[in-house]
Amino acid sequence: MIQPTHSSRRILLPARGWFIYLSLCAALLLNLIPLGRLPGIPDWVALTLAFWCIHQPLKVGMGAAFFFGLAMDVANASVMGQHALAYVLLAFAAGGLSRRILWFPVVAQALHVLPLLLGTQLVMLMIRLVTGAEFPGLLYFLSSFVAILLWHPLNYLLLLPQYRAIEHDENRPI
């Protein structure tokens, strides 16, 4: 499958389904690391979900977002459906914007992903406030900004298994 980006015109191998869901499970495990209430820790599931919904919108969508959202709700003991709703909206927006976002270089992709991640956090914050929680402060949104700084390494890491080996063949022009 051809992935249009400015930085690379390489033809990528198809993404394997097991690798996609393994990376989402690894992101879920990263979210479960008990780091307390440190500001700036990114939501790894949201970041990885946004990546796969942009790069493989036919393989990862709202169903996977709902499943991993419920898993996060259970893991965090939060209001049931809080993460699920936010992740489904993230998957819908990322899948809808995937063709547009892929035309930009990786740095510009990160800037396009920032409103998606901020929107995800805003949905979760609104649900918390409706259920009676206190406003956590503006540092709550710092994790989205840290996440876009991690977009480039995550992009490289998750696309690495899809890169085709560069081998020159006289009979094959591509």
Model segments located where?
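Terminal, non-globular segments
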Residues: 1-174
